[in-house]
Amino acid sequence: MTFKKIAILSASVLALSTFAVSVTESPSTHVVYAAKSKLKTRIAVPKGYTADLIEDWCDSPNSKKLTRKLKRLSRRGMLSNKFYDRRKADKRKVNLANLSNHDQYELSQYALTLINSIRTQLGLPKFTYTASAQGFANDIAKAYNEDNWSDYESHDISAINNIAKMHGLTHAGDNEYEDLAGFDMTTGHQYATIYQVKQGIYYNIKQFAFGGFRYHNWKESDKQNLNYYTEWYHANDLFTGDYSQEFALSLSYLIQDPTNKVNKITSSHYIHVDPENIEKKVLYEK
């Protein structure tokens, strides 16, 4: 099994247009990353990369000066951070179409650790995992499956807002809660090892943080090309804001072509909830 493609789409109102950022990073490129002398599950932020800089770019996305600076910093971040998980020998397989509660929790905590490693370096409060956010995330993934929807179609805005209403959250018609990513499965089944799924999550979050990086020639050398770092709306969603949000991750699984059952799409839903968006606590915490 290999991970072929990852697509990311922002929760930011300014990034709701349909687009996909396609990348590939084979397991052979995932070498151990050493933070100083200690191995960690983390993503290191380049010096000079700040929350203020991200916010400034979102306020002025046409600024050539800001864009040039963020492109260079993002390239540095993409090149210097490599996937590492101390449980590489763990070949336990998970059902991408039906994660157990244990798998959901483990993957959410893994994503949260990476996100908070960046937020901490930027001087921001950590996000927190809650069962309420997990329930919300799971229902969004279920709705994607029911709508035959994936990250290829951008956000399922209608579903997100309907589920938000069910969970007692504000639902103004925009996407306030989801950063969407995904990876194609090149094998003909719906199982992957937990290690492989974490590879996809790690790469998604690097993309979110560092310019929505996308491959064009499917080569590692693409990371050197500044033209492939194009936006920081995802970074604005996850790596700015001097307040905490509740967080959870869910996966949805779609057979893109039912006639041959080969092209499998796993969409990953990075769900974050601002406590101020909780209108009916009794529904959200049920």
Please name every model-derived segment:
Residues 28, 113, 131, 225-228:
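A generic "functional-site adjacency" signal
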Residues 12-15, 143-156, 182, 187-188, ...:
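Contiguous hydrophobic segments
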Residues 286:
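Active-site signature of cysteine proteases
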Residues 7, 17, 22, 126, ...:
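Generic hydrophobic alpha-helical segments
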